[in-house]
Amino acid sequence: MLSLGVSIFLLVFLIPENSGLECYQCTWMKNSQSPDNCYKNLPNATACAKDMIYCVTDERYEDDEFISIRRFCSSMPMDGRCTEVGKAKDCKYSCEVDACNFSTSIEPSKVFVFSILAMGLVLHT
């Protein structure tokens, strides 16, 4: 019988993940007439193109006031930092799990989390 550590290793690394990432994809601006379908009330997550492997949240502030948010798929990771130009600030966060761009918190990848758990179990036994 396989040990729990070996079973987790096989589960994480040998079973392929879903081939397509799903992210929230929408835009909301404070002064727009559009309904709030991206800030507090999110639409359903939708499939990204195959080369898009990150979900991104892009928040914009002006004079420290929240003015817009954009959620989208990306082929490049964002560093989770904010850049400031004058009174404007732009903060971009990325993650690698389906529908993970629902907030500004960065969610660790599934492989990373399971790897840490598997290592802990192997070292513990």
Curated annotation (Swiss-Prot):
Other noteworthy facts: The scoloptoxin-05 family has remarkable similarities with the three-finger toxin family commonly found in snakes.
Localization in the cell: Secreted
Keyword Disulfide bond attributed: yes
CDD domains: TFP_LU_ECD_Bou
Secretion signal, residue range per the UniProt entry: 1-20
Superkingdom of origin: Eukaryota
Record key words, sorted: Disulfide bond, Secreted, Signal, Toxin
A single MF term (Gene Ontology): toxin activity
Keyword Kinase attached: no
Biological source species: Ethmostigmus rubripes (Giant centipede)
GO cellular component terms attached to this protein's record: extracellular region
Tissue specificity annotation: Expressed by the venom gland.
Main location: secreted
Name recorded for this polypeptide: U-scoloptoxin(05)-Er1a
PTM (free text): Contains 4 disulfide bonds.
Record InterPro entries: Sleep_regulator
Family stated for the protein in its record: Belongs to the scoloptoxin-05 family.
